[in-house]
Structures are given as C-alpha cells and as structure tokens.
Regions:
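Signature of the first transmembrane helix
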Residues: 1-58, 88-95, 118, 153, ...
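Helix-terminus/linker motif at the lipid-water interface of multi-pass membrane proteins
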Residues: 13-27, 99-102, 160, 229-260, ...
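Alpha-helical transmembrane segments of polytopic membrane transporters and translocases
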Residues: 18, 29-46, 75-79, 178-179, ...
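Hydrophobic alpha-helical transmembrane segments
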Residues: 33, 109, 113, 143-199
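Alpha-helical transmembrane segments of multi-pass membrane proteins
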Residues: 89, 93, 97-100, 104-128, ...
C-alpha cells in the first residue's frame, strides 16, 4: 500500500515540475489559484465526513454493532451529498469575484466553473474514504491514487509534448480529481454490503448516536477546517489577491518543493489515524504512546535529513543547470523560478515542525 502511495505522490511531484515548466511562473500561479479557489469553497462547506465515519463507524464496528455503523454511513453520505450540491452553487456565485479579484483576469471565470465540476464528482468521497479506512482497504485507496496519478500524468505529458496551454492542464487535473472522487465511492459501495450486510442502507437513523453529539462533532470539524482554510490552505489565494499570479506562482513552486519533503510521510497520515481511533476507543494507552513515538521519530528523522539537504544544495539542484552521467544538461526549474527559493526556506520551518508531528493534524 505504501509503495502505491509513494509512487502516486512521486508522479504528482514530477507532474508539478512539468506543469511549471510548461506554463511558466504566472501561468503556474493562475493554475494554483483556480484549483485552490474551487477546493477551498468545498472545504468551507465540508463537515469532514471522513473523520466522522472513522470515529463513529469505527466505534460501532469495534463494539460489534454493524447496524449502527450502517446508520452512520448512510447519514454521512446524505449530508455530504447535500453539502456538495450547495458548495457547487456557492462556487457558481463566487466564480466572477474570484476571477476578478484573485486571478485578476475576468476571462478565467469559465476555468473556475469548469474545475468546479470536481465538487460534484466528490459528492460522498469523504464518507467513502472513511469507510475504506475503517474496513482496512488501504490497498484499494492506494490503487485508486495510482490510477489517478497515471491518467493525469498521461494527459499532462500529452499537453507538454503538444505545447498545449492552461486549459489542457486544468482538464487533466479535473479528470484526475474525478477519478479520485468517484473511485472510493464505487469501491466503498462494493464492500459495504459485505461488511455491514445486504440492505445496510435500510438501517434507521434511530440507531445513530446522540444527534447533538454528531452535530457537535461535525460542526467542530467544520470550524477547524474553516480555520485551516483561512490560515493554512489559502496561501496561494492570498498571494494572488494581495499581489499577482506571478507571485502566486513563486509561492506555489515553493509549496510543490515542500510536498517532496512530506511525500514519504503522507501514507502514515491515512493509516495512523484509524489506529489511533481504535486504541482510544479500547483504552489501549500504552500501545497508543508507542505508536505515536515510533511515527514521530520516523517523520522527524526524514524531515531533518531533507531540510539539511535543501538548505545546503537547494539552489544548485533545483534552479541551476547540471549535467548527470548521461551527458545531458538537466534543469529542474528554469532560472525564472529562482525567487521561490527564499520562500522555500521560510516554509521549511513551519512544514518541518508539522511534518514531525503529522499525526496531530487530523485529530
């Protein structure tokens, strides 16, 4: 599973570099703003149904109450589907403002509307992902990620070879987003009858935990997600709003490089959180402390090693032309991207710390 996820993340990292070289700094910034704008509208209205499913379905399964688990999944799917429709409606209303004030180009409004279709394709993806995590189908998740990465890679490489523009790249990412959205839904619908029994969707809502408790959890996670959107996940949008897509392109480049740092740790996030939930539900505190200590040591060691390498050799490796043993001159990013380097060093501080204690992020 980890190998699938690692390959998928590696492909995504390479695609980011290829896309940056194809579009240039400003075009790369516009791409980041459009994708970020749509994603953040969705996050603002998201109740993080995946976390709710992992918590309450996981508890019900641990207590051998499959009917209650089915009621949780059913309710989560309904709520998430409704909020996805609302999110797309809000996006339609906000798209002209986003194009005018953030991208600073009204002609990009159709691009926002186009990529916004991904919100509809992810109508119950969070719920489905939570189901796959609770039922330990990590291989299915990893395989979906790999397929999505390969399809997106093929489309972007085609765009690069044919010298296509921003629209072709955006469509490539949209197709990938639809795969990553619909894939978990299809797989979870396959496994749910086998785990919860046929007719699981008929489980009455009366089996749900206390409505106030569920609503409180959903609202608190939505509030937490909203804070993250404003303070952490909207950096490219803020840069575009206060400066221009050019500066947003520099910032997005720095973020893309940072993603290389956290790439090997990403698989730990989706696999560790369900284990934490199970240990907490069972009160196995010694195992929980041991698990957190182990994953923190692994994440911290990797982060420190990569950070030192970037500080010492980042400018030479990333933004300078260098000649490997095959005799061809290779340059990862053109020199026009060099202003992203100081941003990268600043981001290393915060992301390095967050990367070390990554297990605390979804809680």
């Amino acid at each position: 599973n980890s190998s699938y996820l690692f390959v998928s993340n590696a492909i995504s990292a390479v695609l980011s570099i290829v896309t940056a070289n194809l579009l240039g700094v400003a075009g790369f910034g516009v791409l980041g703003i459009v994708i970020g704008f749509c994603s953040n509208v969705n996050r603002l209205l998201s109740f993080r149904m995946g976390d709710l499913v992992v918590k309450y379905m996981g508890e019900a399964m641990a207590q051998e109450q499959p009917r209650r688990a089915a009621a949780v999944v059913k309710a989560a799917m309904l709520v998430e589907s409704v909020t996805s429709l609302i999110a797309y409606g809000v996006l339609v209303l906000l798209a002209p403002l986003g194009a005018l004030y953030i991208v600073k180009d009204p002609t990009t409004e159709p691009l926002i509307m186009l990529y916004g279709l991904s919100l509809l394709a992810n109508f119950s993806t969070e719920t489905a992902t939570g189901v796959l995590q609770v039922t330990n189908h990590y291989r299915s998740q990893a395989l979906i990620n790999l397929i999505q990465s390969l399809v997106t890679a093929g489309l972007i490489i085609w765009a690069y070879v044919t010298h296509a523009g921003l629209l072709a790249v955006l469509v490539a990412y949209l197709v990938g987003k639809m795969i990553i959205g619909l894939g978990p839904i299809a797989v979870s619908l396959y496994w749910l009858p086998r785990v919860l029994g046929r007719g699981w969707w008929k489980a009455p809502f009366s089996l749900l935990p206390a409505r106030r408790e569920l609503a409180g959890f959903a609202i608190s996670t939505n509030f937490s997600g909203t804070i993250n959107v404003i303070a952490r996940d909207s950096e490219v949008l803020w840069v575009g709003y206060f400066f221009s897509p050019l500066e947003a392109g520099y910032y997005k480049t720095a973020l893309a490089i940072i993603n290389l740092v956290i790439m090997p740790i990403t698989p730990f996030i989706s696999t560790t959180y369900p284990e934490i939930t199970r240990y907490v539900a069972r009160g196995v505190w010694t195992r929980l402390r041991r698990l957190l200590g182990q994953v923190t040591a692994i994440a911290g060691s990797w982060t420190i090693l990569v950070a030192i390498g970037l500080l010492l050799f980042g400018d030479v490796i990333l933004f300078s032309a260098w000649q490997p043993i095959f005799g061809r001159v290779i340059q990862i990013y053109p020199e026009e991207f060099l202003p992203a380097l100081p941003i990268l060093f600043i981001l290393l501080i915060g992301f390095g710390t967050a990367n070390t204690i990554f297990w605390n992020r979804p809680l």
